[in-house]
Amino acid sequence: MLMIFLGITITLFFTDVILVLAGCRKNIYSLTKYAKPFLCPLILAGYILALTPLLPDSRNIMLMLSISLACSTAGSILADYIKKRICILAGAAAFTAAGACFLVLLHPSFYLCPIPVWLYALTAAGLAAADIFTILHFFRKEDIILSVITAACFTVLYAFLGAAVVTAAGSFRLYSLLLLAGAVLLLPQSFWTAERFTRSDKKNKQFETTLLFALSELLVCAGFCCMILL
């Protein structure tokens, strides 16, 4: 079981690195386009595949996973076809989060989560806040409502899905491995954002947004590490 989990995690890590490097060669829009629509379902798939033998009603969980992956892929393709950058982010987030909601409903124990899981939710909220400020910073005022919806979807995806999965793990060892894997998966994007921040001009419009984005992602990583220590 541990070897299967490590194999999935390592695969996701290198996939993350490749996608982030591809985004570095373009710009922030390219990173959003190529990385996030694929990373959400990939991380979701890795977690569920690793935990399926430990969870009740595994058939239902795999069914919900399939729905989530299908919806996320359809949303990404549709958004790319529309050629509107905001839709690429919102579509992938909304459809993936919709599948995540089904998974959360299968685990009502989320509402009895320990303090570390709620700490996860708080750090995830910081990342969602960075998403909404990034969108508001780069797009027109008429996209504000869609921006709020997108940030809400990311909050559901990162906080509720992650909390439900780690709660269902049951084993402290596996729980710690999941949190560590999540921190590792976030590091490449955090490093890329921090590196972009150092190159930004203080007079540049992107400066404040990039700083907030980098700090929020590093906060998520720090949250993972704190939960492991707890």
PLM region spans:
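Polytopic alpha-helical membrane-helix bundles and their juxtamembrane interface segments
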Residues: 1-230
